[in-house]
């Protein structure tokens, strides 16, 4: 059974983001908001890798590559959010999320699900942006109609 390019690279995004955040937590930098933004680098890597694999396989249709790029980033985002939910409950649930939200853009006391849903929307928005940027970067490699 062959794993799809999108799923494989989405899992790479998930693992790299997970290792990055665990490393930040272990080094005591989990509360530094600006370091959290660097996770977009891992999304760029996974999406770019998916497009490179598609181009190497001779898939040069712009739309199918855009869908592939978007699916790759969304798989990475969804897996990362699921990982965050599991990790948050392991670390104490709502109390853990409230300690995170002190350095994030929340007011009040968000629950694990509120925090995760807001990060899901942020992740979907960043997936669209990353997909557009990577597709623009590789634009000259695709067939013109």
Where does each model-flagged region fall?
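Hydrophobic alpha-helical membrane-insertion segments
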Residues: 69-87
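Cytoplasmic juxtamembrane regions at transmembrane-helix boundaries
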Residues: 136-145
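Functional transmembrane-helix hotspots
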Residues: 83-103
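Hydrophobic alpha-helical transmembrane segments
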Residues: 109-130
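Cytoplasmic juxtamembrane interface segments
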Residues: 44-71
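Alpha-helical transmembrane segments of multi-pass membrane proteins, especially transporters
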Residues: 9, 13, 40, 64, ...
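Transmembrane alpha-helical insertion/packing segments
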Residues: 1-54
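Transmembrane alpha-helical segments of multi-pass membrane transport proteins and ion-pumping complexes
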Residues: 14-18, 44, 77, 81, ...
